[in-house]
Amino acid sequence: MRCNERNKKKAIFSNDDFSGEDTLMEDHLQLREKLSEDIEMIKASLKNNLVCSTLNDNEILTLSNYMQFFVFKGGDLVIKQGEKGSYFFIINSGKFDVYVNDKKVKSMGKGSSFGEAALIHNTQRSATIMAETDGTLWGVQRSTFRATLKQLSNRNFNENRSFIDSVSVFDMLTEAQKNMITNACVIQMFKPGETIVKQGDYGDVLFILKEGKATVFINDKEIRVLNKGSYFGERALLYDEPRSATIIAKEPTACASICRKLLNIVLGNLQVVLFRNIMTEALQQSEIFRQFSAEQLNDLADTAIVRDYPANYHILHKDKVKSVKYLIVLEGKVELFLDDESIGILTRGKSFGDQYVLNQKQKFRHTVKSLDVCKIALITESCLADCLGDNNIDASIDHNNKKSIIKKMYIFRYLSEQQCNLLIEAFRTTRYEEGDYIIQEGEVGSRFYIIKNGEVEVTKNGKRLRTLGKNDYFGERALLYDEPRTASIISKATSVECWFVDKSVFLQIIQGPMLTHLEERIKMQDTKVEMHELETERIIGRGTFGTVKLVHHKPTQIRYALKCVSKRSIISLNQQNNIKLEREITAENDHPFIIRLVRTFKDSNCFYFLTELVTGGELYDAIRKLGLLSKPQAQFYLGSIILAIEYLHERNIVYRDLKPENILLDKQGYVKLIDFGCAKKIQGRAYTLVGTPHYMAPEVILGKGYGCTVDIWALGVCLYEFICGPLPFGNDQEDQLEIFRDILTGQLTFPDYVSDQDSINLMKRLLCRLPQGRIGCSINGFKDIKEHAFFGNFNWDKLAGRLLEPPLVSKGETYAEDIDIKQIEEEDALNEGEPLDGDDSWDVDF
């Protein structure tokens, strides 16, 4: 049985609207310059504050400067229980009483603070505070506090990133890789006279001076002074060797530091990454290798032989080369000779050998000689064989071309790798002469075609519509449906060559749940739906902003879900931008494990999202029926969620509210991620506190900026809930501040009945408080999670191809709500009323 049952958790979305508390504080605000003792008291209080626990002294001082002075008389109300809070206060003088439900529970004096939760978001006050005597407070508004945190965080990131750009060892890294390193920077403070590094010691840290000065000594002799922007120790990231100098802080000095261990976590071995980047870029410049898949290029980079050569060395000699087919210069310079005549010089990142890769039987006629000490990557016949398997170069490129074409089409896009490869192998080639009919309008078709060479004309009722050429395709619907062709395709060139596959072959490869899924998805997309054609059957769900109805399309009887969102609720809660963003993101989503939007409507009262109907109920309920999940069950659900979240992250979309309540199961038992009200397209970092408290990552709470890493944390919470039962942090808490406190400082523990070490290890690594150390947040992304030992026996390909048996398949239909149609009119009436004042042009895109 699942222990520690919990109620469904709701998302919160912080905003900084003007509140009654803001108005009240205006009456008590007085200008006063802070004395040194005031600043010290404020700093001490802030350091004990949950949200400020990770800030350095300079950041604490900056926040102290934004504190305002408030004066109260005995009996004055400061904050009121139940009202939305927006200020955090520190008592400067006097006594203040705390009341809960009109009962006095304690008194507070100088140095005490209250209202901490208001710094995080606009939650209701849990107590009333009144001045017992005349007194004064230092206070800061949430909007000011979080805006200051954002400003400090942005300034720090941008400054660190500019320093990273100046370090030559990072020159060949990508923008994403440099950002990874910037996020991994740790600030270290040194006092005057303090040693930063010592000559002869072995080190693994790179230091960049952010503030202050430092002196360089070699053999106790002063050599020079380093200023802001100088860096030292870069070789420590690459090599195990002693420091060549001693460096001592000359004045109070701040350094951004990067250690090799953390760098290996977020990026991998720096030298390997640098060389891999050079190889990948060189291969992508090759006429041959640019036609390889990304996976094949990675395999080549992994198997390439990297060697060091001295100056003036014959690396490859025309009479002695046997297996080498391609070379890439990683460091140094080489000279290329043909028939003993120099034909060019290759520098770092340059490559050579296309002709020998394309024709592997051709004898190597060139000579390659090093001009200075250099490092070369060599690709041999064996490397190519490991990468391509049994295929030759032409066959591999042909396979890749077909794959790139069919992956653009929804009917094939989400086939498993095995299904996709079987389909490609099933393609046959056929030729047509000029004027030949390839398919004829009105005939029932059974073949799908891709144009390999030549051009064809598309005609309908004898009228020419358009011309198709190489890599264009037609006839894909014939693989699923017995229906007449809607147009004719006629060979236009002297000779047209096409790849084709027959329906009978396709149906041997694609069967069962995947075939049913494709048929239903395409049928849904084919149907043109208008609002007046929909008939409501019942209410199947409800949320903060409205209801979800089960409707059917009267002309076709296809059933859909219709999410009805109240305009009044959206406007009153200032969520206009978020509902627009939800529509934009949902409309672009196209993944089998994410809810599919058909179209949107609007009227004077509501917005409407028409989506596919998902009938298997919520994952929240499913895991309660199943009890504690077995490892295979947890693998299935977590793996499915990972594929959906990975799809979003590839498009720079952070979901921000991942939890079992936001995942439905379809009639086959596979997952559907729903409700994109908290999602955001992200460039750089986001700062808004949004999501469900128990599932929030630490970086969301702290307010210093976050990215897609927050969804990885939520995966860890879900996995913990699947396997352990309760939530990992704040399980017994409803007070949001206490939930946040446990997320930031609580110990992660595991029940005695959970003994699988792979599961425990993955949960620990997903629930790492430092995002840069969290599995799935390195440059490898979700690959690290998929290759974790927890998924050691899991078949990702079968999951994608719907070839796994789900843990639970609903008997009949299950919905979060099931309200009879008679109550629907009452629900609709709640959305009606006089329009709210304000600009109504914001919803023109609906």
UniProtKB/Swiss-Prot annotation:
Enzyme class per UniProt: transferase
Site note Part of a catalytic triad required for cGMP binding and cGMP-dependent kinase activity, residues: R477, Q525, D526
GO molecular function, one term: ATP binding
Compositional bias per record (Acidic residues), positions renumbered to this chain: 825-846
Naturally occurring in which organism (per UniProt): Plasmodium vivax (strain Salvador I)
Mod. after translation: Autophosphorylated.
Protein name: cGMP-dependent protein kinase
Lineage, top ranks: Eukaryota, Sar, Alveolata, Apicomplexa, Aconoidasida
Region (Autoinhibitory segment): 1-22
Positions with a binding annotation for 3',5'-cyclic GMP 1: K106, G115, E116, A118, R125, S126
Cofactor: Mg(2+)
Active site residues per record: D657
Known partners and oligomeric status: Monomer.
Region (cNMP-binding domain 1) residue spans: 51-166
Annotated region described as cNMP-binding domain 2, given as residue ranges: 169-268
Regulation: Activated by cGMP. Not activated by cAMP. cGMP binding allosterically triggers a conformational change at the alpha C-helix of cGMP-binding domain 4, which bridges the regulatory and catalytic domains, causing the capping triad, composed of Arg-477, Gln-525 and Asp-526, to form and stabilize the active conformation. The cGMP-binding domains acts cooperatively to activate PKG.
Lineage: superkingdom: Eukaryota
Binding site for 3',5'-cyclic GMP 2: R466, G475, E476, A478, R485, T486
Catalyzed chemical reaction(s): L-seryl-[protein] + ATP = O-phospho-L-seryl-[protein] + ADP + H(+); L-threonyl-[protein] + ATP = O-phospho-L-threonyl-[protein] + ADP + H(+)
Region (Disordered): 824-846
Region (cNMP-binding domain 3): 288-391
Domain AGC-kinase C-terminal: 792-846
